[in-house]
A protein has these predicted regions:
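Single conserved hydrophobic/aromatic residue that forms the stacking wall/gate
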Residues: 251-263
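Divalent metal-coordination and catalytic microenvironments
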Residues: 10, 64, 114, 146, ...
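Active-site-proximal segments of metal-dependent phosphoesterases and phosphodiesterases across multiple
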Residues: 40-56, 118-127, 135-176
């Protein structure tokens, strides 16, 4: 028996959210998906509201993961404690709302899902993810584990993947909003993709209005970034896990769709 997991890249803005609502169920049917994990931390541009979380779960996501914008929308804080299907990075302070990993029932039995935040080139430094994952894996002992590593640096993501090779079933990256083409199965059986990409506006600079990004690089930006308008795409990857080996047997990059549009 095998488990087919669809991991969807960062949902950006209302356009990305509508794209997810319009296409997720058909993609799940097309790829015969058993379990779906969606990174939702940019649904508000930066951050996530309870209403947006509910919309993504209603659209077909089983689990939502977050990242460095986990608490940008204060109204999500209480919701993180109440909803077991949303994970914020496990290497944030334990006193903060929510949880960073969990065990979830699937057709092959319980599976561990973990959310971690990288430390390179980010505005703040969470606890060391390499040390935190050691503690998490002890609690998830014996289970297939899937990791969303929300990080900026490719080197940090690759180092984590080789550190966990043979210890978890798969690791995918989020945060950069650019899908990579380096899908691979590492020597000891762990599946890896540096970044899933984003679910959001095509004609944008990683999801935001190009003119705002240009102004920023010219040293002229005076307003907050806003998600771009126009056609959107959904990006992610399908991971197929064999129940006996509990390691990845196949990676397939899901085909983007550009039919959703928000103006």
């Amino acid at each position: 028996m095998e488990l087919r997991v669809l991991a969807v890249g960062d949902v950006v803005g209302e356009g990305g959210l509508q794209c997810l609502e319009q296409h997720l169920r058909s993609l799940k049917k097309l790829y015969r998906i058993d379990f779906c994990v969606v990174n939702g931390e940019n649904a508000s541009g930066t951050g996530l509201t309870p209403k947006q979380a509910d919309r993504m779960l209603d659209a077909g996501a089983d689990i939502l993961t977050l990242g460095n914008h986990s608490f940008d929308r204060r109204e999500i804080c209480a919701y993180l404690d109440d909803c077991p299907y949303i994970l914020r990075p496990a290497n944030l302070l334990p006193s903060l709302p929510g949880r960073g990993f969990g065990t979830f029932e699937t057709k092959i039995g319980p599976v561990g899902i973990v959310n971690l935040l990288g430390r390179c080139n980010l505005d703040f430094r969470p606890d060391n993810p390499f040390r935190v994952i050691d503690k998490v894996l002890k609690e998830l002992d014996g289970l297939p584990v899937l990791l969303d590593f929300h990080a900026e640096a490719t080197s940090e993501k690759l180092a984590m993947a080789y550190y966990l090779d043979g210890k978890i079933s798969a690791q995918w990256g989020t945060h950069t909003h650019v899908q990579t083409a380096d899908e691979q199965i590492l020597p000891k059986g762990t599946g890896y993709l540096t970044d899933l990409g984003m679910t959001g506006p095509v004609h944008s600079v990683i999801g935001v209005k190009p003119e705002q990004s240009i102004a920023n690089f010219r040293g002229e930006l005076t307003s907050r970034y806003e998600p771009a308008a126009g056609p959107c795409m959904l990006a992610g990857a399908v991971f197929t896990i064999d129940a006996q080996s509990r390691h990845l047997s196949l990676i397939h990059i899901s085909e983007p769709t550009r039919q959703a549009e928000i103006s």
